[in-house]
Amino acid sequence: MKRKQLSGKHIGIVFGTFAPMHVGHVDLITKAKRANDNVLVIVSGSNTQEDRGTRAGLSLNRRFRYVREVFYDDELVVVDKLDEAGIPAYPEGWVPWVNHVKELISKNTDNPEKITFYVGEPEYVTELNRYYPQAQVELIERSIINISATEIRDNPMENWSFITKPFRRHFTHKVLVVGSASGGKTTLVKDLARTYNAPCSLEYAREYQEKYNVRDDELDTNDYIHLLTDQYAQTSDIIDKGQHSGLIFADTNSTVTKVYIDYYLKENISQEEFDMLD
């Protein structure tokens, strides 16, 4: 996919760690978009344990991908990342940090006439005016949507409605019920899903075998490849839709399917075929 470049003459800049991005962030970016031709969103941080997002399981790369996903259909917004690994702590780090920001602006825009930063801390106003005097800096009031990323990390379920959909997959509780065949797993999972008003992912093999009218002892390598990939896709789709309250149930997953493959097929297929299933 060709990299999109912002062609507007007035560019708004919004930066942050976005761990996670919530609707308050989106509200701010929307306001910046209304006041400018385009907005460049910069996801900052690092993939090290010094980064609070990474410590919470949201690496810089993952946050960057998720924020891009939030704005996948917005032609007025471009998302890029700033890896702060190796940049000294503030205040010493301001000069290299601003230089990195300038590089991102040059990379993603076409010689804008006006650049405006939207920040939430007075310190940012002072330092950006000092090290980037060509740009304007606006200190914004906190969004009327009263939520913070810290509150979400501390209690994601209570603040579920504030989390943007791509980030919900990270905070979703996934309950897998395991056990032997014909042991009542599916019934239990359905009952739990009804009780907690949550979606469930059932064993895809049943649907597959009914659709293609194939018995257990007739399943071959190609069938198991479909079972592995489609089981994973089915559960992932439920999680990724984000149309739940942070809880899903499953009566199997691709790992369980792989165990059955190891048991039933390993002695009957070539090593090359077996490796395809890993």
Regions found by a protein language model. Give the residues of each.
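Hydrophobic positions on the alpha1 helix immediately C-terminal to the Walker A/P-loop
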Residues: 188, 192
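The conserved Walker
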Residues: 181
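ATP-dependent NMP and nucleoside kinases share a basic, alpha-helical "lid"
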Residues: 102-108, 127-131, 253-278
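Conserved substrate/cofactor phosphate-moiety recognition/catalytic segment
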Residues: 194-236
